[in-house]
């Protein structure tokens, strides 16, 4: 019988789970190489290698924006364009040829990526009950670890299948460890129904695993940053329930808006005291910026529920997303469509008419009709806007980094002959830690990729309750 080979890097044990951008330390388990080879039996013969194997599964939580050649996929929408010209990236976006680039693995490799993560979860669940305890652990501690690891594997598997669903719809639900030399197709010739896939599997996995996970306090300890905890399972459950209650899926899922509202409310009831909106500053723009960038543990960001833990990064991690006047490659450039979607600070819409996408209607004119009651001024379009606009978009005249953004033709951020200069008049501010630009770009900062924030739970509740016909006061 052919033995499955698994590769391990033993330095991971000393690294804890402060995960780096390493995609997959163990992912080549079907390849054969001369060093660091362990069979499946050897990996699960001791707790140390089992622990390493399990923690590596966290590497399948994707971090960063989905990209083609260093440019975010938002550029494929009407909300942004890419300024990144290298390797034909801009051309790929403009003509929709997203697969031409060899760097489009986050599109072409998604299927393989998540099934590899799922396989690792299945392998752990198959073997962990037979792994001997570590010498220094008591029987009670070992039993706790086994319970936690199994619960985390169930969560991660459910999350990976949910990500697959968002891209492909229901895909084959593989819960066993398939033999690469065996029959891989006979049991997976038909798609599961939406109810079988989401309601009977994903939602059940999330509900069943919650009790075995760490509580938030244990997850927040220094050795466990980023570990899956009970609130994460409940939060993902709320997200999935909201999708399933929508008009798109409700007839197949059987889930109502009220059930989705109840799911969000259960999080607020059981875990709401542990989380809150990140309001550590009197400036709303700063609060929003920090809610996105601040680390959940070291920087006490209690709005973050579920995120991909990462390490502090420097200039090399952001220069492809930074304005050319700062020495970067421009990257994702927000469009006027996106800017126009932001309301005024008083909550009113700046324009009088919008289409179904949320963009203002131009009706053949150079500018959309202004809602005069909103206070919007066409000669000062960025003043008194929703503060999230200034936290998301770098526009002309704003002070940022080591200078003032100037996108006028031939100026600092739109110089003649620079192929990466913004084509829209805007650059991205969100997700870019400005502190990295200090001292000649020698600063560093965490760039954690948030998957679920507490703000989403509040919005899930409000949206579902509103659709269910809840009272205005409750909404």
Predicted regions and their residues:
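Elongated scaffold/linker segments in the mid-to-C-terminal portions of large proteins
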Residues: 42-48, 90-99, 103-113, 276-454, ...
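Membrane-proximal, proline-rich intrinsically disordered regions
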Residues: 22-73, 383
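Aromatic-lined, polymer-binding surfaces characteristic
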Residues: 164, 170, 179, 195-196, ...
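Conserved, well-structured interaction surfaces
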Residues: 46-64, 87-168, 187-200, 204-222, ...
